[in-house]
Amino acid sequence: MMHCLVGSEMCIRDSNWSYQSHFVLYLEALMRQQTLLPTYIKEMIFAYISGLNGCQYCKNIHAEISKKLLREANDEQPLLDIENAGIEEKYKPILKLAHKVNADIKSIVDEDVDQILQYGFDEQVISEIISICGAAQFMNTVVVAHQIKPLDDVQNIGSAKMMIEKGYDGLAEYMISKRNK
């Protein structure tokens, strides 16, 4: 007998939907709302944190979304090596802060924030980075604990395309349609 814990998106969708649906709405507001951070950077942060946490399912989807939004061929570099990443210089301190939020939140110092603010970002961006990291950590925990396997390349590209076209609301609609079958 397969327990709900192991490898099934249905476990998340069916048994936890009453509260998971609210989280999807939160993700829609957090990740898709127009702010000083472009959506591709938000998705890159989510992918980066997911990679650090060993959640290949989330890393792959969010990296694909970021890549498609950025229209660059190589999404791995920013996720593995911040200093040599092929992104604008102003976004590197953002990824460094995200790393500290994920790895050792108490290690954050004023200089980390100042490095971001010097590029013209406001303090709302700091809160946004922290919130994206928290959202990624939560989803990584849910996905890894349920032992959900990464999608294959075709499914991953399709999921990224759906997320770009329909947002997290599209994900919610998809999950509801599957639940109602």
Q: How would you label these PLM feature ranges?
A:
Residues 8-9, 110-126, 135, 139-181:
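Secretory/periplasmic and organellar redox-cofactor proteins
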Residues 18-24, 56-58, 102-111:
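Short acidic alpha-helix initiation/capping motifs at coil-to-helix transition points
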Residues 34-52, 124-127:
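Immediate flanking context of iron-sulfur cluster ligation sites
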Residues 20-41:
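Short, charged low-complexity linear segments at domain edges
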Residues 47, 89-108, 130-133:
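Amphipathic, charged-and-aliphatic alpha-helical interface segments
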